[in-house]
Amino acid sequence: MIVADRLNTTTSMVWFPDYENGVGDNDAPRSGTHRAIDMYRYVRDLVSTTNQDGPRTLSEAVEPIRSWVDRDREVNLKFVEMCIIDAYTTDRRQVDDDIDAQTVVILDAILTQDGTGLDSNGAQYYRDVVRTFHDRHIEHAKAIAENKRLVPLYVAMYSNWSNTSAPTRATMDIEAIRGRYTVSVPESMERPMVILFNDLTISEDLVVFATHGELIKYDTRYPPSSDAALAAMSSRRARKGGERDKRISLYMVRRGIYSPGMNYDIAHVHQTPGVGYVITVISNNAPTVDVPRSLVTALGMGGDDDQVVVSDVGGGVTYTASFVLNDITFVTEYLQHYTLLKCTDKATCIFVDETHLMKYARDWRRYTIASPRFIYEYNNFTVKFSATVESTRRDVARVSPYCRIRIYDAPNTQIMYGMANDITAHMIEYKSRERSIASLYAENLHNDQLLRINVRIMRDSKRVKREPGYLARQHRQVRRKLQAQKTGTNADVRSLIGVNNYARQCARLPTAVFDVDDVPEAKEHITYQLPNDRGTLYVYCDHDDAPYPGVVTNRLAGNKTEYPTVPCCYRLRRNANGDPDEGRTQSFYNTQRILNTQAFGKCPANLESVLMCQRYMSRDEVDAAGMETYFPKQSVVGDATAVRGGVNAGPNAAIEAVMRAVHAIKGRDSDPRRLVITTDRLADERSEMVSLLTCASQELFDMSATERNAWLNDTVSYFDPLRLVKLLQFHFDVNVYVYVRGARVKPVKSVRTTENGGVMLRFFEEYEQAWTDNDDVLVVPHHYAGADYHDLKVHESSVVIYVHSGTEISNLTYPHVEYIIFKRHRLVVPMIGKIYQRLLPKSMRNVYSFVYFDVVEDEDERDSLTVDEANALRILFYLSSGKSVSTEWSGKVSTTLNAPTTQTIDGIGRMVGVGGRALESMYSTEPLPSLAVDNHDHSMYYFDDNVKRKRLMNPEHSAKCQYAWYLNKLARVLLHLTAYTILKKGTLMSDLFLVDDVRFNRLHDSINTLFETGVVDMDSYGNLLIAEEERVLAIPSTRHVAWCTMHR
């Protein structure tokens, strides 16, 4: 018997094999037979004064649930006593009043089983229990309400138990029918003569024509043509007597995405003169009732169906059906091993259909944990079934996981329903005896002898193929070994300490004994006190790599109140009486599960292949940002060059990931796992980014200013790192590289370093060349409108974050974000930066790398910005106050790159197009951010139809454009600064950017070009310059007006 808190529910919810409860079609979950009760309500109703059998004694109340009471007799008997007292006193309004004498006598008779009615407990005892009724009732109600996974099951169980009518059996979902029929029709009738019912490939909202080995799929929104239907038919061939053989499959439509049940329609194909073959569909002719009669109806359309004869050619009809067991996630490997242990000469055996496993391995889908097909011997019939964990997919989130049992090729409905009940009983019995079963085989799950039995299904749906063998012989060997362990004195600690996810919290499990004399002499041991005075355990470690016992804080289990700490084995000695030093633990996961904040995990393979180790692991340089003090040991990570760190799941996971990554690169002792980050702190950090929202206007080009502010101010909405990566960069003063798992793009095949220090990337031509169904691809995210952002030179430090959705069983509301660190961090991230740049579109790299540029005609008279001027502008526009900017970087001259000559923006400062020209030489400086402007009516710039739109990178976006200008020397900078000033109604600091009259007049040709083309309105521009003369140009206004007049 197992208390249901092992299933993430409450202690009052008990799986109870002795109690059978049927669930009807209208209940939730929809189908299946359940054995479970709410023990509190069950006992109260059993002993209630309204019970037709009269009051029950304590022994009578305990008898139906004796197996549960015996698990902890003292505690559970006290629980039953309180239920009985509550049943007799819940109608009292004043619980502080004395219990009347008659009630005391009745309660004593029930609890003490004493018919004389002597007051054994006394009124005070009952009064104390009654006073706690309200608190206990509220606690029980809250516990049930907090049960997120089994509330529907609880409601169905109690409502059915309270119903006095006979239990009803739920209807199973029929998914496929196999059969073969011969149809005889007169020669004059143009009708198919043989119709086959074959297996179906169940897929959401698909219509399937199934033939001997072919599947033709198409969306239900586009009905099949006659050609498509005829293509699914085998070719006609002549038969004796002039008869012809034609085949067509059953036309089936899956309606709805929440139920896998099939509604059956029969398709009728006939030839019409002048038209050809026509498909007619007869709805609501379900062949589950009378297949021959349904076919006769279909084939006899428009004629006398008495001449149509349908007969079975042999083999019978087989059914494929499924049913939902409940909302619990059953791990199929446990079910398989458990049934193997029970397999004897007289018991039902379940084996694995390895042929089917290997044949259809690639058909397993994401978001579903699929099992191999099991071979089940039932009433001399051999039938196959599978157990899968499914859930409704909504974007990256999965909701309401449930277990679906699918039965294949049942010969009739009686066998099908009998198997369903038998399989359900197997699974519920497994859950009921989970602790005792675990003590038999849990320690052997990693044993090669057990794994060689078949294919093990991992929790993250990764298949590990093991060497097959003679199943029967291996089963006997495993059972003998497990039976020998069962009779020994040593026990698996998980069978004694009821903690969920024990193995995930402790990589090396200890061995527990009840007598200190059973501890081997050469082993150290600790004493562990079980709760509720259930005894003392002596725990030691039987691992060569982790010989020292200790305790670890219980962070994952639902019953951590009862077990705040659990024993574990460690490589080094540690204080067994206190919480372990979290910085010294080596929690490392090889799967893609969501990590806790104290764990590291393996990075996906693509990130490793892109880096190609880069020889940085063997370089002699000393990395000041090395992480040797807390980076997982080489023996743990193997050849991995990077690890990912855990972050709390939530809408602001991206912010926390960057915070932990920044903390990690501060120094050798900056362990990111020690950083305490609360929800309030994340909300504060997010609120501070509102002032920097302008810098993300390119990525948020499809949102208005109001929508942007509302999104960022809503601290419980998802902070999308793909669109808000610039905010993270500017706020934390680091370069942020974002990798995403799961994108269907061509992955990088290799990385080669060029002579000038750059990189060349080679890509796989086809997706299937590089990855199988079980692998994921890491890619650089593509922002909206294709304008990826990269700015390596603004920030001195760099971090890497990783966006993914965990494993198939992760129930996430938002995509999760984690950080990635390298043991030699500063030696790796420059290479990532080069790869990142290389992945960006070339035209975008030119724009963002060389926003300010100029043709260097004369080195003595250069009209480009200097590095100091660029840094000053960066301080003014780019960074929040208090951020320092490095002055060590200097621009480089390049003779091979193209520079943008035309940039197109819209009214809210987003760039939607760019054109370029080749330059002989170029001097690059830092870019300005997108314009921080509000919606406005003032139009200083005009879009000229004469602009050559074909030169824009994104011509389809030019229709959205409200403003455009040519970029020519410093004129572009002046326009940018002036527009920024007037639209934000602010001022520029003249000591940061000075332009005198001599330099301004030197550019009059370029500015005059802007006026002549009509891109810039000269009056508006002149007025703006006059208004800013003291702060920007520092020239007399009369000269400025005269200059504007001169160029009219």
Swiss-Prot record:
Pfam families per UniProt: DUF5757 (PF19061)
Record family assignment: Belongs to the ascovirus HvAV ORF146 family.
Record flagged with keyword Oxidoreductase: no
This protein's UniProt keywords: Virion
Predominant location category: virion
Taxonomic classification: Viruses, Varidnaviria, Bamfordvirae, Nucleocytoviricota, Megaviricetes
Protein known as: Putative structural protein ORF84
Compartments, as annotated in UniProt: Virion
Residue ranges that the Swiss-Prot or TrEMBL entry lists as coiled coil: none
GO cellular component, one term: virion component
Origin: domain of life: Viruses
